[in-house]
């Protein structure tokens, strides 16, 4: 199985999304799709994502915005990843 999640995004916008909308921002493999990203987040963080939005940045990286369920706090996952 290929590595789907490459690294978390550590920008101010990513932290603001964690605090306000319970969304974590990740850089993922360019070839991965939304269902693979959901499975990777579910297995890595033991939480079920509600929604995944993706985009390809001008630097040719794929960025995924993963909205977590309300029973999971994105700030806890951010602290675990070292974003906060």
Which residue stretches match the model-derived regions?
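Contiguous, often N-terminal, cationic amphipathic patches that form binding interfaces
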Residues: 1-84
